[in-house]
């Protein structure tokens, strides 16, 4: 599977707070490749209550996202069975805000394991997220998880106020369950 999505059941309540948080924490020294404004890379470590709530939910989604984007959902599937579902951790997280004409150039997040984008705001005319040339419409409250090595971008926005919280996830290979590895070798 190229990507995995989940919808946050409290997105409509939390998103206005997240939008304000992103807009109030712009990093004036950096802009998005293609325009737009962004926060620094460690938004998830600032002790911001609304971001902490979102991150707690994202953390809970990561194990299932890892199974799905790895292509294996069965314990009999060797690839899905050999990684520790608790071995993933958000390493970077930042907010991005785009207005009309702003976009993101094609890029990827290698060498991270997975990346995500959570849609905070997508007014009419907001550009889709394009992952390996597949368009994914931004839907407020929806998160998209994908392998970090996949190329992605957005086209120029046709409206003001598109806002995302995005991030990169690392995997600690020291947490691989060798019990699972041995069980599948027999």
Task: Briefly describe each language-model feature range.
Residues 79-156, 161-164, 170-175:
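Catalytic core of non-heme Fe(II) oxygenases with the double-stranded beta-helix
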Residues 179-186:
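Conserved small/polar residues in nucleotide/adenosyl-binding loops
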